[in-house]
A protein has these predicted regions:
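Active-site microenvironments that recognize anionic phosphate/pyrophosphate groups
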Residues: 1-105, 111-184, 190, 203-215, ...
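Gly/Ser/Thr-rich active-site loops/lids in small-molecule metabolic enzymes
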Residues: 192-197
């Protein structure tokens, strides 16, 4: 994924520079699981090359680069959501061999499809049920509770980070916006900066421990019941 090895026909968009001087690059996935021409598996799959320097991992890059990466995610989500058939856009990253990374050069992926995954559908259904019963968002309530407890990791005006109750993985962390919004495109500039700071903090700690990890954004194209957040799940075995 270094600049000199990129196939021009795969480039979707360059960010931060022209030609081979880009900082972040969006590519069509060379071996996509979904395509706009496949009726049975409709969608788009892109690779986001997070840096042109293959000697760097994301955790080592400055906070402003994290913010730029989030802006790229926002841009790609907006572009892909223009296709009205798209119901779900997953942004995810696999870092390290134990997390399933097959390429050393740091990258993440954007997966857009016309199918809402069953687990996302179930989460939305439970969120709606909670809201009907309690007249509030379940995640907004969880944020308030966790910011007062021992699982709190980081907090500022815009974001909240905590280790979830009964974590699936050691050192798991969830990053939430305090403002209720349903997807990444709704982030304002201040929230992008705070989210970048929080993500840099979490990934830097995992990098120091030498842990592989996956991260993925929980979001939907449009459903106010959903509360946008990011799960970071370390893989230590």
């Amino acid at each position: 994924l270094c600049p000199e090895n990129i196939e021009e026909n795969l480039i979707v968009r360059r960010y931060g520079g022209q030609g081979k001087n880009w900082k972040i690059l969006a590519l069509k996935n060379k071996f996509p699981a979904v395509t706009p021409g496949n009726k049975r598996a409709y969608g788009y799959q892109e690779v986001i090359v997070e840096t042109s320097d293959h000697t760097k991992v994301l955790a080592e890059l400055p906070t402003k680069h994290f913010a730029k990466l989030l802006e790229v995610y926002i841009n790609r989500t907006k572009d892909l959501a223009k296709d009205k058939r798209i119901e779900y856009i997953l942004i995810f990253k696999n870092e390290g061999s134990k997390a399933g990374a097959s390429i050393v050069h740091d990258h993440s992926q954007v997966f857009a499809t016309d199918v809402l995954p069953p687990e996302v559908y179930e989460e939305l259904k439970l969120s709606k049920k909670y809201k009907l019963k309690n007249k509030s968002c379940a995640y907004c309530d969880i944020i308030k509770q966790e910011m007062k407890g021992p699982r709190k990791i980081f907090e500022d005006k815009h974001v909240a980070v905590f280790a979830p109750y009964a974590s699936e993985y050691h050192y798991e962390a969830w990053i939430f916006t305090k403002r209720h919004l349903d997807n990444i495109t709704k982030l304002n500039d201040s929230e992008v900066k705070s989210f970048a700071k929080a993500l840099k903090l979490v990934l830097s700690k995992l990098n120091k421990l030498g842990l592989s990890y996956n991260y993925f954004f929980h979001q939907v194209v449009s459903d106010n019941t959903q509360h946008f957040y990011l799960k970071v799940q370390p893989r230590d075995s």
